[in-house]
Amino acid sequence: MLTLEIITPDAKVYSSQADGVEIPTESGEIGVRTTHIPLVTKLVAGELKVSKDGSVESIAVDYGFVKVLGDTLSVLTEAAINVSDIDLGEVESAQARAEEALKKAELEGTDPAEVERLSSSVRYLIAQKLAKGRSRRA
């Protein structure tokens, strides 16, 4: 079994044993099982899937980093939420507001760091919607 920890700047939001984990990375989705080679890679906004005892739990994650060492998988991310806790209406509303703020910032020549922050927010909200949509079909 793997020990999985998901940590945000605010708290450790998830800690559990898992048979395997599917992780969204810059180079595509990777699967981690026990005895995986040591790895550090960049995490992208998307759906992280935790397999345990024959079931799969989905967690929407923002960008960050992943470290695999031995049978421990550490995910350091700006934000994470269990798909079962996502309110789709709230996410769609937040996405519309974030996209509007992003358009305004780009038109006004806002500081590039602020534009990237807004763009990241939009990506994370899209990841939540996609993850929630997949979980309802499963």
Protein language model regions, located:
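N-terminal export/targeting signal detector
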Residues: 1-3, 134
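Acidic/glycine-rich phosphate/pyrophosphate-binding loops and surrounding catalytic core
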Residues: 84-138
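Compact, glycine-rich, soluble single-domain proteins
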Residues: 5-99
